[in-house]
C-alpha cells in the first residue's frame, strides 16, 4: 500500500510540474506583452474571483509578505490592479487588491489560451471521463483545503 501510494505521489508531483511548465511556456508571450511575471500572473488569477488582502495572497502563494508586496506594486504600476479600502464598518488598515479593467482583459486573454490548451489535450476524451476526473480532483482539493486549515 505504501509503495503504491508513493507511486501516486510521484506521479502527481510530475503531473503538477508538467502542467506548470506547459502553462509557463504557453503564457510567456502574453506575459511579455503585459510585462508581468508568471508569479504576477498567478496573483491576477487569484483576484479573478474576489478581492484579496496582501496577507491572503501571501498565504495562498506560500511566500513572504515582502515578495508579494513587490508583486502587487508592479501590478499597480502596470495598472492591472488597484488598492481599495473597505467600507467604514471594517478595519481601515485592511486594503484589498482588486482587478482593474486592464487586469480583467489580461485574464480574459489568459483564459482563452488555457481553454485552447485544455481542448487540444482533451479532445479525444469523452465528457463522462472528463467529468469523472473533475469529481475526483474536487474531492482531493476539498481534502487539501481541510488539511491545510487544520495544520
UniProtKB/Swiss-Prot annotation:
Record has Repressor as a keyword: yes
Pfam families (UniProt xref): MarR_2
GO biological process assignments: response to stress
SUPFAM superfamilies named among the record's database cross-references: Winged helix' DNA-binding domain (SSF46785)
InterPro entries: ArsR-like_HTH (IPR011991), HTH_MarR-typ (IPR000835), MarR/SlyA-like (IPR039422), WH-like_DNA-bd_sf (IPR036388), WH_DNA-bd_sf (IPR036390)
Residues in HTH marR-type domain copies: 1-142
Protein name: HTH-type transcriptional regulator TcaR
Lineage: Bacteria, Bacillati, Bacillota, Bacilli, Bacillales
Amino acid at each position: 500500500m505504501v509503495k503504491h501510494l508513493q507511486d501516486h505521489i510521484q506521479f502527481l508531483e510530475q503531473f503538477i510540474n508538467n502542467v506548470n511548465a506547459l502553462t509557463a511556456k504557453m503564457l510567456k508571450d502574453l506575459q511579455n506583452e503585459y510585462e508581468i511575471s508568471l508569479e504576477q500572473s498567478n496573483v491576477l488569477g487569484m483576484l479573478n474571483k474576489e478581492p484579496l488582502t496582501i496577507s491572503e495572497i501571501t498565504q495562498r502563494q506560500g511566500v513572504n509578505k515582502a515578495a508579494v508586496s513587490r508583486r502587487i506594486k508592479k501590478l499597480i504600476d502596470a495598472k492591472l490592479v488597484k488598492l481599495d479600502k473597505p467600507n467604514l464598518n471594517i478595519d481601515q488598515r485592511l486594503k484589498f487588491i482588486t482587478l482593474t479593467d486592464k487586469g480583467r482583459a489580461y485574464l480574459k486573454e489568459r483564459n482563452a489560451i488555457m481553454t485552447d490548451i485544455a481542448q487540444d489535450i482533451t479532445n479525444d476524451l469523452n465528457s463522462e471521463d472528463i467529468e469523472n476526473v473533475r469529481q475526483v480532483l474536487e474531492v482531493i482539493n476539498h481534502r487539501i483545503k481541510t488539511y491545510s486549515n487544520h495544520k
